[in-house]
């Protein structure tokens, strides 16, 4: 038996060695392609003899290829031509830390969809470290986009990119910074560490995931100075070929910083303060956590714009939301022709002095058709309107308010609106809303809110609740 065991062990060891050699051989076959503004598409595409155009590199970049793009401005579109595989993905990236710009300045303005980077029905791809900028339209029937992913594209990573100055100048136009439209099924979508800024979007959004997208991460992005929604997760717009799964689901929106997002002055919206920093419009099973949203119209919103449709199983936790113009967090439809929000969880968020324009959205806005939601352990500090909770609809049922902290300030009143009735007495609001006994009206004792340090002091009376 010992002899047979030794033979078996030797055979196993040999097999492992062969496997390692084969893996190393495969790895060595992975290809690198180089592109430079002084290159030549008739060359070999090597480090010393780079291609000139992104188009040539895309045509040659098959599974297992990394395309290194050298410093410079490329006045062309990058259209990905091939898919990678799980073991041999394709990457387009800036060479080292080179400043690589893909510019739309010289593009002709035509109707239809136009984008500077396009991925359609492709898989296992990464776009990394590129600047995508200056694409403009004046046409109502055109949509301009920095990065556009569509079809059944999956296993896509967009990371460390910068998207600037994508603009529609039409009164009823559309533009996106980063757009993913799942007409077919998409999965494993990763939007990480990008900057998306200085956009004019018309009716559209800065970063949008729309349609049949199952599984995603939107993390550590900076989204700022745009005239419509910052991050949007959409369902029920007719995007998916399969209407049963026409909604974004099963994902995380985490540690993003979003600010100066406002539709005010956008020709599509006029003088409305209606753009959310982060918006779930009909998505399901989505966690929104540890984001910071400020100086926007609405901090975070979850609902559906379509009647009898819902944002469902949305978990909004540990976000810091301050100085927004209309409200901090909003759930439910903005009128009775919309859908609503159900089976969702809003917990341990800081909502600090929102409603700065006095529009009476308060810190927490509860709108049409909300049911079976849990709102707990949040800390709310009223803004100029003094409204903590604004609930101007009676279509509010089976929602639980537990252990929330309302910031009591000396010499300042508090206002709560519940099912259209206004309360200035916390005890009366508490009774009307059936808030639990541990809900409190007290100073939470932030460390330094003037410097946006919303940590609680060691002896805060609500520290155990907030944690």
Regions found by a protein language model. Name each.
Residues 5-20:
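Sec-dependent N-terminal signal peptides of Gram-positive bacterial secreted proteins and lipoproteins
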Residues 23-55, 71, 96-99, 444-451:
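Right-handed parallel beta-helix/beta-solenoid
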Residues 37-75, 109, 429, 460-464:
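Acidic Gly/Asp/Thr-rich repetitive segments characteristic of extracellular carbohydrate-active
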Residues 41, 65, 111, 343, ...:
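Acidic, glycine- and Ser/Thr-rich low-complexity intrinsically disordered tracts
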Residues 55, 59-63, 75-91, 101-128, ...:
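Extracellular beta-strand-rich solenoid/capping regions of secreted or surface-exposed proteins
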Residues 74-80, 104-107, 111-116, 136-145, ...:
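Short glycine/acidic-rich loop motifs that flank beta-strands on beta-rich extracellular proteins
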Residues 89, 95-99, 123-134, 154-167, ...:
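Right-handed parallel beta-helix
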Residues 303-308, 332-340, 363-369, 389-395:
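Short, contiguous acidic/charged loop-to-helix segments that flank catalytic cores in large enzymes
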